[in-house]
Amino acid sequence: MNMAVHGLTGVIKSGDEANSFYHDAHNLEGCCDYVMANPPFNVDKVKAESTANAGRLPFGCPKENKHKEIGNANYLWISYFYAYLNENGRAGFVMASSATDSQGSDKDIREKLVRTGHVDVMISVGNNFFYTKSLPCSLWFFDKGKKEELRNKVLFIDAKNYYTKVDRTLNEWSEWQLKNLNAIVWLYRGEKDKYEALLREYKEALGRDNTFADQVHELSEKTKILRNEAKNAVELADKKDKKKTQAKYDKQLSEISENLAIAKEANWLYEKFGEGEYRDILGLCKVAYTNDEFKTGDEDSISIEEKGWSLTPGAYVGVAPVEECQKFIKNC
């Protein structure tokens, strides 16, 4: 139905043939330029023999239990998405946060995956990004066509504390927050022109030439003044005009609030990366080497190997300074 609504065509499988664990129904191994997926997390009771026979396991099959079942299918999905890529293919998918650091055969598979040099970016996502689940998750990105200078590196981004609160049970990334996360990746890849274009986009959206920090201050002060003005105006208005008066001020406050949100995101980005030079930011992003042999002499140099092949961003980026945490809470 979803494909029909969007005018798309495709081959839809059903029944046992549609079970990805036991069938490569579309014969995709090695064929895909891009893979995007949001698979079910932590699927259990997957038949080990049927799974092994279905292939697409370049790093081997997760260990089976005494019932000859795979107790957690997360690394089946991860293996499939990698296996589907062609020689320059790229993949991006959502995965349970536990998969970045799971042990046993999962760790062995993860080591083999990291050693390929094709893990590109790992991002931690906070709670409440799903409508039906409150648990955190991770975003995994593979790139078989990485630049040679990035081949033995992985960018880690911890975005658990970077979000917009929609309501009590739902968080999201705003349009500008998504652009900021993209900007970190652009700078890591040396795509400074894209970063500069985003700064121009911010300036055009705000329509001002003064610094982003100044704009945050000015708009914050303007908001305080207008709120007090609105409160007094509503109190002084005739009873029949109170709702109309409040609505007028609400509209003005909404417009200022929108600009303030944009200014805050612009300032958040510019404070960290200025005119466009990637750097590791404590508590936010860190570039790690895949193996010890590729580490530089820099005392801050770190490898995934020395972290026990963990792909958890928090293990690399560290903890943000207290003032940064307080600033984030204030902005929220």
Residue ranges and their predicted role:
Residues 1-30:
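S-adenosyl-L-methionine
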Residues 29-332:
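A conserved structural/catalytic subdomain of Rossmann-like adenosyl-cofactor enzymes
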